[in-house]
């Protein structure tokens, strides 16, 4: 698969006259304007965890590949009629990986272990605790339905059946399924390369000395970790000073090494917001004033044909925008398709009066079957991100929330995070 052409500078331009964009419309525009931007490569099943399938996966053989026993017991043919019966016990046994080579005739039984192939002529297994052995005879009392305690060939997966569709992001359990289906290699998309840039003269790297008028760069470690959990390859550009020349140089380095660029800070239109100014000067920036709290504005641009997501500098707003907007866009670029989080509709354990006009996301967690929210809605309270287990999504319209009312809870797990 060839790599798609680079984006045009006007890729993210909004229609004339649009000033405030609803969240749903912003997501729709992103889905429309972005496409998969990575090539395809083969990958061993053992190494495919987290990779995104470029082609559907077809079972190479049935599972189980032959009829086998679900229990330890004795194989026989055709089930048992009611009443006490005596069957000839054949010498030998059938064990997993050591199938019995002979033929089992009606009226005969053979020792069989769990997972072992049923011998030719057998279709039923009687539990070992339900029989008695006397000399070379098996004493058993029926009835027993034909096919009991036996697994049919292919009852789990049939050879030639589709087991995963293209775009599926593989999980550890999926690797077990593919191995069981006889697959050794699958076709996957190459990992999306995402460059991460933090801007701001006030920023210091974690662990460095900092004056009281400086702050530590919380966004870059957080965003890099999130991206790795989503199976993407991180290109860490570092902290960039607040001047146009440094920003241009950082964008050049990022565009050379990555498929997409994520920046935090400088996305607004202030005197020191050089990221948006540089993108605007190149003709490839659209400032999306999205009706969302926290998180506005979101700068979307193109640099050297590479899409740029300009996140707010505030860590809470940056995190929320990453989950709500960047994640579905990045998954689309990575080949997994545009995805929405799975919402849980649960009772609220809080009260709130919300004004109309924008969608709101509150840091929240589930306790005793109800959803509670962080004590402060202030986006400066970074600790609330770790306190929370997800986000409450409040609709664009005005709302009065009271305890017990059903609300929409988006757990972090629905965004691919623990």
Segments predicted by a language model, with ranges:
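Helix-rich terminal scaffold detector
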Residues: 1-11, 15-24, 184-311, 315-318
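Flexible glycine/proline-rich
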Residues: 17, 24-27, 41-46, 55, ...
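Short, hydrophobic/aliphatic alpha-helical segments
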Residues: 48-62, 99-111, 158, 300-301, ...
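Residue-level signal for inorganic ion chemistry
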Residues: 30, 73, 160, 196, ...
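Short glycine-rich, flexible loops that bind phosphorylated cofactors or substrates
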Residues: 119, 172, 269-271, 416
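Short, glycine/charged-enriched hinge/interface segments at domain edges or termini
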Residues: 2-21, 75-236, 371, 375, ...
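Intrinsically disordered, low-complexity, positively charged segments
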Residues: 17-85
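Glycine-rich, charged/polar anion/phosphate-binding loops
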Residues: 58-62, 112, 147-150, 179-185, ...
